[in-house]
């Protein structure tokens, strides 16, 4: 590994992966699956928090289908997946709130954070819905 890159040991100079350690965590893999669902909008919904809409295109599985595939391949028990999704929304809301605060303090010169503050409340509501209603 060189800095944030994993290099292919069989092919010198070939980058196999680029790592972003800033948001990395150790622990339950369902934490990552929960966060993936924050970034995985489905066709016909507007959550107001997604950063991409590519998963709304034909051919992409729904979050439920993705969870079923994950469980079938890993054997993971997804009975508490809604908790991980809720946690991910709250974490995302906190991260966005931090970005907004730094922007307002002038610590993000040159970065356009227009619209970020409007994402916080929907994230909190989606987190609540995941925890209380089991919404994925």
Which residue ranges define each predicted feature?
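Active-site activation/catalytic loop segments of kinase-like enzymes and analogous catalytic loops
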Residues: 30-74, 88-106
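Short amphipathic alpha-helical segments and their helix-coil junctions
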Residues: 14-19, 62-77, 122-123
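All-alpha amphipathic helical-bundle segments outside canonical DNA-binding/catalytic cores
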Residues: 76-88
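Active-site acidic catalytic loop and adjacent metal/ATP-binding pocket
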Residues: 3-37
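Pocket-edge positions in alpha/beta enzyme catalytic cores
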Residues: 25-28, 55-58, 112-115
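Regulatory N- and C-terminal appendages and interdomain linkers associated
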Residues: 94-136
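Conserved NTP-binding catalytic cores of kinases and kinase-like/nucleotidyltransferase enzymes
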Residues: 6-16, 74-79, 113, 127, ...
